[in-house]
């Protein structure tokens, strides 16, 4: 049996580094779920997303974050389309989401991490990861502008609110949406974001080598209390991995099973009885436990595909020497 390729989705069928391949997969899914849908809006959204990450979108620089790259956004978007299809297959007709909601859901997924991407006139920040604490709010602002631009302005504020299901800036209970169906989509957004990245073939290597530097640049590895006392949360990429099992048990399971109401189970209907994402997530957790039991991080030898960020990032120490960290400020 061929090993799964690092640039492909959980089924090893869709190349995530190619936006056109993901678009074709999403459209195929939606043609099976709906009699018609706004395919032109999806095509434009995928094309614009490709240009945004590449730095070909007006006023924006290329996406330079190491972990939150185009592949992740495409992976998450495809996972969401599959959850939506599974939902439509599983519920009564009056509970179905319908094509209009589904298209807005996909557009929201494509741009859920747009808040990491810097403007051309941003001379205060030198890597998008510095926006980590506020990146979802910046994504919301981008979505509002984008949906107005593509004549879907009636959904602009809704999508801006809904994208917060993918982050921690607003608790899910405080996200305001018009009806329960939109909340179901929000729960799917948050779920797809988690299950896609945590089932990635190179998830563990990416956490150690790419996510940790992002957290450092986002000033997220140290917590400061009211008296100014600092507590180190993550000392290194390896320390991040040591604490990942507890994060999964205490945070991820709570979000998937409670806050997001088990919507991950809709993948079973889409895959006709299979749970590819949850199984992939479990494999990564089992692999991590083996690494931790052996206390041998050299076992993590998979090589994630390069992206713009990895090709241009000088290394964490060199970066910090060149650009001492500053508190984030929205630009």
Model-derived features with residue positions:
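Short alpha-helical scaffolding segments that buttress acidic/His motifs in well-ordered protein cores
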Residues: 45-53, 105-109, 159-167, 188-192
């Amino acid at each position: 049996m061929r090993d799964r390729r690092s640039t492909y989705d959980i089924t090893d069928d869709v190349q995530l580094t190619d936006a056109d391949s993901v678009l074709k997969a999403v459209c195929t899914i939606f043609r099976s779920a709906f009699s018609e849908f706004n395919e032109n809006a999806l095509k434009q959204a995928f094309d614009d997303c490709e240009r945004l990450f590449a730095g070909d979108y007006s006023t924006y620089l290329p996406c330079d974050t190491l972990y939150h790259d185009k592949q992740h956004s495409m992976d998450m978007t495809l996972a969401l389309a599959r959850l939506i299809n599974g939902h439509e297959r599983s519920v009564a007709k009056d509970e179905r989401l319908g094509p209009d909601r589904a298209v807005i859901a996909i557009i929201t997924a494509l741009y859920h991490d747009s808040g990491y991407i810097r403007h051309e006139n941003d001379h205060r920040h030198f890597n998008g990861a510095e926006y980590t604490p506020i990146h979802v709010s910046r994504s919301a602002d981008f979505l509002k502008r984008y949906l107005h631009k593509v004549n879907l302005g009636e959904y602009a504020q809704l999508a801006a609110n809904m994208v917060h299901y993918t982050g921690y800036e607003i608790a899910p209970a405080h996200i305001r949406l018009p009806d329960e169906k939109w909340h179901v989509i929000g729960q799917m957004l948050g779920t797809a974001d988690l299950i896609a990245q945590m089932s990635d073939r190179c998830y563990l290597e990416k956490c150690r080598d790419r996510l940790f530097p992002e957290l450092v640049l986002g000033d997220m590895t140290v917590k400061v209390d009211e008296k100014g006392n600092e507590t180190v949360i993550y000392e290194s990429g390896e320390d991040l991995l040591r604490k990942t099992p507890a994060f999964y048990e205490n945070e991820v399971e709570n979000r998937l099973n409670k806050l997001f109401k088990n919507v991950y189970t809709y993948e079973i209907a889409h895959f006709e009885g299979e749970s590819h994402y949850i199984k992939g997530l479990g494999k990564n957790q089992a692999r991590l436990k083996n690494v931790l039991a052996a206390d041998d991080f050299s076992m993590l030898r998979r090589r994630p595909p390069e992206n713009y960020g990895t090709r241009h990032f000088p290394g964490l120490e060199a970066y910090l020497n060149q650009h001492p960290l500053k508190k984030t400020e929205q630009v």
